[in-house]
Amino acid sequence: MKFEKYIDHTLLKPESTRTQIDQIIDEAKAYNFKSVCVNPTHVKYAAERLADSEVLVCTVIGFPLGASTTATKAFETEDAIQNGADEIDMVINIGALKDGRFDDVQQDIEAVVKAAKGHTVKVIIETILLDHDEIVKASELTKAAGADFVKTSTGFAGGGATAEDVKLMKDTVGADVEVKASGGVRNLEDFNKMVEAGATRIGASAGVQIMQGLEADSDY
């Protein structure tokens, strides 16, 4: 298993500076991670810096609350793709899910999938805020909407991925949709637990520490 190709090397803090973005880009190139995941304002710069590498550019949409309108999420997605994003991590409308407005949730995802024009879309369902049945339903809606991944967490809601949630998500979506675990994956042991549970992508700021077998102190 090529550990590095599981990792979206992530920096989503609002105070992220260009120097810090440069650091994660340099690290991603050195370790040949699958992608760097950055806020939309950094996408164009990251795409330019990574043009001569295999490392993809991932960004986030409707992040971290998922509470922006569907039209806004679609516009954000189109803008990100124009600026060079290869992959899109969107946040669902969590309140709509809890209301039982499942058509709204699915249509929200579908709009982003359409706007992404064939680029990979990962759907963040924020598992820490959901019960068992809501995790199942959100995963089902992700699959029905045609997204590529269902993803556990933003890392901004006070909790991250658990192996139990990853397994539940994978059992729900089956072989057609992949699972991304994010939030709280700080070391190789955490990484292995998520992969064993069914994750094929790991979102973490601790990519270097994971590769080196060390421990990180970040929540994402």
From Swiss-Prot:
Residues forming coiled coils: none
Any one GO molecular function term: deoxyribose-phosphate aldolase activity
Keywords for this protein: Cytoplasm, Lyase, Schiff base
Designated name of the protein: Deoxyribose-phosphate aldolase 1
Domain of life from the UniProt record: Bacteria
Keyword Lyase: yes
One GO term describing the cellular component: cytoplasm
